[in-house]
Amino acid sequence: MFDLKEYLERVKTEVTDPILEYMQEAEIEDFTADDVARCGELLVEYLTALSELKEPVDADIMAQVEKVVLALNELNEGLDYALIETVEREAIWELLQTAAVDCGLQNVPEDVTEEWREW
């Protein structure tokens, strides 16, 4: 079952907080806290859009996946691909994948992001 509150908390604990912590520990200057916040905002927009689907069907769910992946691609590209690295990639993928399934995705590919993802 899709629990928006739980997923919103996961954005913070599994994606944005770890990136910010790494950024500070490693003294990263390739991106800013605002860039990390934008990444979180894109994920929140995705989760909110899923929660607002009245009768979720695969096409509508996958349209939201495509939209967020393309937006994340654009954000990451603008930062010379520095924001979304291996650890972040896995956390973001897992969040997008499980949210799509919990929202009601029936024909579940191994990776819902694969078709569009550049990170």
Predicted regions and their residues:
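A broad, low-amplitude sensor of folded, mature protein cores
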Residues: 1-10, 58-59, 112-117
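Short terminal alpha-helical segments
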Residues: 1-51
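Residue-level recognition of alpha-helical structural elements
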Residues: 35, 54-61, 81-88
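Generic structural signal for well-ordered, non-transmembrane alpha-helical segments
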Residues: 37-40, 44, 66-73, 90, ...
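Amphipathic alpha-helical binding modules
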Residues: 79-119
